[in-house]
Amino acid sequence: MRDAEFWHNKWASNQIGFHLEDVNPLLTRFWSALAPKREETVLVPLCGKTEDLAWLATKHDHVEGAELSLIAVRSFFAEHFYTPTVTPISGQHELYQFDELSIYAGDFFTAPLSKADLIYDRAALIALPEEMRVEYVQRIRGLLNPGGRILLVSLDYPQQEMAGPPFSVTQEEIEHLFAGMHVTRLYQDIADEHHPKIAKQGLSRFSEEVYVIENDK
């Protein structure tokens, strides 16, 4: 992963403003839009130590995450008082397993991930610069089973007004990246003048958006 050092430094210095202390309300509100079944497998790319993993594990029998930072993976299990089984894999990755949860620590692009029926992306696509997004989407498309669905949370703002991450990924770019799949925007939350991104960072506009992306093949 080409920006690995950047993310290792973020976790090492605890600069993790992207981490939410609670389950993302957009997940709990819109997960049902995927018509998920308990037996369907779930993948959470670039998962950090998100609380969303624990929530998803209450809904599904197998939830798999992938995270570059070993600090993040170990913190997730420690903060939940879980004692995982740890398996080294080919010297490049470690697999952490506890009940319904499995997390691969290491490079997402080379981790031996299982194919998934459902993918949840809250902070993966928007964490990557434009030149890496095509490779990332090719990777998750290759990991999605026929008939699989993706719940994607994205941001839309004038990129020239703020350096990412998180980056702006517009509906037009999402439709281009996932060409051949069915893309539906479920939700758009347009920030008002009191939102920190506008009031404090001076953006002219900012919105958070939720998409369902379906693999009809």
Curated annotation (Swiss-Prot):
GO terms for biological process: methylation; response to metal ion. S-adenosyl-L-methionine binds at W11, L46, E67, R122. GO terms for cellular component: cytoplasm. Transmembrane segments: none annotated. It catalyses: S-adenosyl-L-methionine + a thiopurine = S-adenosyl-L-homocysteine + a thiopurine S-methylether. Its main location: cytoplasm. InterPro entries: SAM-dependent_MTases_sf, Thiopur_S-MeTfrase_Se/Te_detox, Thiopurine_S-MeTrfase, TPMT. It is an enzyme of class 2 (transferase). It is found in: Cytoplasm. One of its GO terms (molecular function) is thiopurine S-methyltransferase activity. Keywords: Cytoplasm, Methyltransferase, S-adenosyl-L-methionine, Transferase. Its EC number is 2.1.1.67. Belongs to the class I-like SAM-binding methyltransferase superfamily. TPMT family. This is Thiopurine S-methyltransferase. It comes from Vibrio vulnificus (strain YJ016). The lineage of its organism: Bacteria, Pseudomonadati, Pseudomonadota, Gammaproteobacteria, Vibrionales.
